[in-house]
Amino acid sequence: MHRSTDRILTTHVGSLPRSQAVVDVLFARERAEADASANASVHAPGEGEAVIAAAVAEVVRRQVTLGIDVVSDGEMSKISYATYVARRLTGFAGDTPREPGQDLVEFPGLLRKLAERGSTAKYRRPRCVGPIAVKDTGPLEADLHNLRAAVREAAPAEAFMNAASPGVVALFQPNDFYRTQDDYLTALAGALQSEYEAIVAAGILLQIDAPDLAMGRHTMYRNQPLEEFERLAARHIEVLNHALRNVPGERVRMHVCWGNYEGPHHHDVPMERLLPLVLRA
């Protein structure tokens, strides 16, 4: 991992705007996976892959042109930073009703305006309905190939790739199968471990996306006392650390946030309570 020794290196969280062509590919895939009998052939598989590869090449080139040192693929192939795992792991199906954060619940007028503006995501959030295991490594292999090819062409200082934490997958995709939430988290960690290790083995920095450690407070664990949230968040970190046990610390970084949505955020867990937990990762 490059360090800011001579100057402050520039980077970002990972997800970048998609073109309409990319959006069309992602939602065509979404429709096909939701209903195998649906006519979701807006793009043939080869064409869709070519669209994504071209988008990755362009977004990496653009980042380098703008002076970004540590670039990403913009998550071009992912419809969501957390639900993308349903394409790669077994055990997910259906959809999950949206539940706004506690801060928005207390401002129903704002919540209604956000809904009217189309701020609510339209993609599915599958639920865990069966055993979690690796299903298909093809999407990850394609992501790694596309990013490495783009990096060879644009020559940034370094590149990173996003991967969801076990906790954030559990936050957006509830458990209907495992006996306990802890069993679910453990299964997710075991299945995601190979993705984490493959990214690092490809010579790319791994970024763990873990908003569950902050946003989880006013969403999944909204009804829990703060002390109980801290205990649960600590368990999320233990599970994550186990999944990362073979990854050198200098090859991984972590993204934690309270949710990138327009809202009052008055239920955000305070940094002074959060930081001691996060530093255990």
Locate predicted features:
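Domain-level signal for soluble alpha/beta catalytic cores
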Residues: 1-281
